[in-house]
Amino acid sequence: MSKKKNASSASTKVVETGVAIDYRVNLKCKNAKQKELVKSIYENDIIFVEGVFGVGKTFVINSVALEMLKEPNNGIDKIILIVPTCSCSATMELGHLPGSLDEKLYNFALNEMDSLRKILKKSGNIEPDKIIDSLVKNEKIDVKPISFLRGASIENAFICVSEAEEFTKEDLFLIMSRFESGKMVISGDPLQASRNQVRNGNSGLLHAMEKLTDINGVGTVKFTEDDIVRNDILYDIYKKWNS
């Protein structure tokens, strides 16, 4: 692990169709649980991450995704973002947004894109917006709705499934069934689930955390309120709110 982390601080290039995209990632884990998450991602193929808000789930996952994308010979050719508003049940929502299909999908992934930009900025990259735009233009970052996954086979990709608390068992099973090679990291906070279908006992994330822990190549990481790093006040709010 230490060799991989040291390598992440050096600037390397992602090359697609003759275009070199130069950037650096400098991830510094803030606690033992974040280090556990990084280790699990490198050691497993499919990783489930459960945790409350403010623990850095998305930041760590996306940092490793960018890091692995630029590392040579590790089988990762692109980052694919799958967000809950692109679920089968939300397909109709796409039609109500202006613009092309790609523009609509990227509107749903604004939080993920913002996270990627922040990572690049904190890592010392001068123009993170241009880097992200180049990665998107060269199809190194892509957003896919679940409805487009049926019959597909995803290989050599780092698949980030964020806000997975909104996915039902059926949604999550469909997503996992499309995985062929690379990494798939599925993360969420069940306490923030808003869909009634999920809240009424059909949470795909909770089902996976319970049923799939003993499979070789599958990793599970669970954060608690003690792992909150965003702001100390969030810990106090969480404790009071859930007491």
Where are these regions (language model features)?
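Detector for small/aliphatic-rich hydrophobic stretches
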Residues: 9-11
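Conserved helicase motor core of SF1/SF2 NTP-dependent helicases
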Residues: 2-4, 13-25, 32-161, 165-243
